[in-house]
Amino acid sequence: MEYKAPSTAAITAEIEAQVIADGWMKACGGDTAYQIIKDRLQVYLRRPDDANFEQIYHCAHELSYPFPLTEGAMNEFRPLLTALIEPLDPRALRALCGKITDVIYSRFSAACDDNPLSLTPLAAFIEKVRRTHVTRIYTTNYDDFILQAAPDLYTGFANVPAAGPQQFELREFWERRDDGSVFYLHGSVHLGFPHPMPEGSEIGDLHWFHARDEARKHARFDGSDVSRMDGAQIMRTSVVTGLDKLSRLQQRPMSHYYAALAADLMQADIIYVIGSGLTDLHLNSWLREARSLSPAVPLLFIDYWNGHFLEATAFDAQRKEILLFHELRVYAKGPFGGVRVGDHWTLSPDGTSAIWDNGFQHFLAAQDELDEILSRMKSVA
């Protein structure tokens, strides 16, 4: 967000404005479906501002599959939720899902060119880590700021400025475990579905486009969906959104990214978790496993609180703080306490984790303080 990629609230407002103004949305009923879902969520969640685009997309996607079935349909192709709900028009919901992903893709792609901040501090930090460790970055962001800062990082695709789409390197991905890399767990503004399909590719394969403008032309997939175990399906998308992301990570290359994430976390010398609200439970599960090892993998949590972490969370533990404690095993508050180091670091009593509370840009500018906290942590290789 510091690099001006849109916040959840901003992208939600942008999606709503474009859905309401879009002629095709009006013609197919997508605007009405959006408003119905939003209105019901606002009542259900009790606070109007709590309904965001991921929740709306999730509802639209899940409700879009209760289509009429023929009498002889096999049970595995009968979406189970159909028996329990009275559906909205599935065509309108499907169109709405497509529109939401289009807006996300275009807005984040545009943000990559509008960053007002220098990427030099980010580049310096990545280079610093790479001098001492094999650096494997897993991001849930769609933008390419990391690649702008470190263009030579491996993505699972050939690192050359090719004019056309590039296929995922299925074998090379697993052979290049020691290369500095960045992997886009939830998709990227460089991914798309090329048409016509390149020779040797399969239906629904995501490809990498060096030019974002070219990738944007191929952002949407208009072919078949992917079947799920409950009889419903998953729409193929170049950026993964909604609340149920894990089932969407079964497409290539995300399935390989997620498998490698598990191995890397369990074998890591140190883990940096930067700017995460800890809302992706499929990622928390592997962070928890790495932190459950004996000794635990050292972890640095970089985020922002309004004030020093220990003071800001002394009497008010929100979902993030609860997950930080129970899932990531960062015992730096409550009965365990925490050791204040400098102005913005908190070191857990067991010495295996630390929290920075003053935002990412200030973290990048305070590398001497990072060196100090690393020297005080246990088991940092």
Q: Over which residues does each language-model region extend?
A:
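SIR2/sirtuin-family catalytic core signature
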Residues: 1-17, 25-32, 37-38, 47, ...
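Gly/serine-rich nucleotide phosphate-binding loop at the start of the catalytic core
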Residues: 1-148, 152-157
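Hydrophobic/aromatic beta-strand patches that form the interior of the parallel beta-sheet core
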Residues: 136-138, 181-185, 272, 300
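Short alpha-helical segments and helix-capping/turn motifs at coil-helix boundaries
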Residues: 121-130, 166-171, 284-286
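Active-site gating loop/helix substructures
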Residues: 87-116, 148-259
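Short, flexible loop/turn elements at secondary-structure junctions
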Residues: 142-144, 186-189, 278, 303-306
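Short glycine-/acidic-enriched loop or helix-start segments at secondary-structure transitions
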Residues: 147-149, 194-195, 282-284, 311
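Short, well-ordered alpha-helix to beta-strand connector turns
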Residues: 132-134, 179, 268
